[in-house]
């Protein structure tokens, strides 16, 4: 988190956005999508990084997982370097009833990296929910 704060303090929006996107994508997506996500990431401010870092390090919501009664879907990108496999495994363990889809060839933004596969995974989840 400190490294991200230091980077954000010295980089302009476009440079910071490009850096962040370069670290979260599989590298096999349309340049226009990369530019869009870089623009979104470029809007991140230092306070947002601090709050997100605090939440990641100190906020443990796992004690609430067994209270969830609604259908749950967990979508993970096989090449995601942001959400580590052990974090995804812990979430799946805490929600054994959850539908899980591991999406091949994508990183942290599967909805952009391979929208067709992501949408198919959502449809499969919704079909399973509707089938009861």
Regions found by a protein language model. Give the residues of each.
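Catalytic active-site module of serine/aspartate enzymes centered on a nucleophile-bearing elbow/loop
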Residues: 97-132
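Active-site acidic short loop of glycosyltransferases
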Residues: 69-70, 97
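Short beta-strand/loop motif that positions the catalytic acidic residue
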Residues: 68, 74-76, 80
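Conserved alpha/beta-hydrolase "acid-adjacent" motif
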Residues: 81-87
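Hydrophobic "lid"/C-terminal helical patch
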Residues: 20, 53, 91, 118, ...
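Charged helix-capping and loop-helix junction motifs
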Residues: 1-4
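Conserved alpha/beta-hydrolase catalytic His-Asp/Glu region
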Residues: 9-67
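Solvent-exposed polar/charged
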Residues: 66, 93-94
